[in-house]
């Protein structure tokens, strides 16, 4: 059996979208109830996906503006990014294309991205929207549209609180690294119209 491949997976996204909760939920099967900005240490574990053993290294980042200059230091050597937004925060959804995609393209061009909508349990929670009248839910269709717009191979909605699709997020991230999606070859207009006389 061959040695396991190391995969560095870095989570990014706005502050308070649930990046740390997602990581804690995945690594310990528990849900932290108090919000403390980025207290997750880097984590490494052997994971088997599609019969391949992978040493998965998880890196948490702080989404707050205060960390804009420090955060990119953790991008070096990343194999895949988990780009998270909250399904109950339109601002975090909009920042995927406004802030995060430009940052990732600048500091880590070509690294694949798994787009993740977090807090799935709250999207259908009527009481949450009564208590937070300004909150706007993001639909699955909107998430898929954003995935296409940013060119991410995968979009997954999950809930760290209920564990729904949490494992699927990290399995998808590993799969994207082990089996990158085939690039569609586009012929430029110049190639199509060129004729030699």
UniProtKB/Swiss-Prot annotation:
Superkingdom, according to UniProt?
Answer: Eukaryota
- State where GTP binds: 13-20, 60-64, 118-121
Name the SMART domains for this protein.
RAB, RAS, RHO
Q: Where in the cell is it found?
A: Cytoplasm; Membrane
Q: Which Pfam families match?
A: Ras
Provide the GO biological process annotations. Answer: establishment of vesicle localization; pollen tube growth; regulation of actin filament depolymerization; regulation of actin filament polymerization; regulation of exocytosis; small GTPase-mediated signal transduction
* UniProt membrane topology term: Peripheral membrane protein
Q: In which tissues is it expressed?
A: Exclusively expressed in mature pollen and pollen tubes.
Q: Does the keyword Membrane apply?
A: yes
Entry annotated with the keyword Repeat? no
Which parts of this protein are propeptide? Answer: 195-197
Note the subunit structure: Part of a complex containing ROPGEF1 and PRK2. Interacts with UGT1, ICR1, ICR2, ICR3, ICR4 and ICR5. Interacts with PHIP1 when activated by GTP.
What this protein is called in its record is: Rac-like GTP-binding protein ARAC11
Q: Origin organism of this chain?
A: Arabidopsis thaliana
């Amino acid at each position: 059996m061959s040695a396991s491949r190391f995969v560095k997976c870095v989570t990014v996204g706005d502050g308070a979208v649930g990046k740390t909760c997602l990581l804690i939920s995945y690594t310990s099967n528990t849900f932290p109830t108090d919000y403390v900005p980025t207290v997750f240490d880097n984590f490494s574990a052997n994971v088997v996906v599609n019969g391949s053993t992978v040493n998965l290294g998880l890196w948490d980042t702080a989404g707050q503006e205060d960390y804009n200059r420090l955060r990119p230091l953790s991008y070096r050597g990343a194999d895949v990014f988990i780009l998270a937004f909250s399904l109950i925060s339109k601002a975090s959804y909009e920042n995927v294309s406004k802030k995060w995609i430009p940052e990732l393209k600048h500091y880590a061009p070509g690294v694949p991205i798994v787009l993740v909508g977090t807090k799935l349990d709250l999207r259908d929670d009527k009481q949450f929207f009564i208590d937070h009248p300004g909150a706007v839910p993001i639909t699955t269709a909107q998430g898929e549209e954003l995935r296409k717009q940013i060119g991410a191979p995968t979009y997954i909605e999950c809930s760290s609180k209920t564990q729904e699709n949490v494992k699927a997020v990290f399995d998808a991230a590993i799969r994207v690294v082990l089996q990158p999606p085939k690039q569609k070859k586009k012929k430029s207009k110049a190639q199509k119209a060129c004729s030699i006389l």
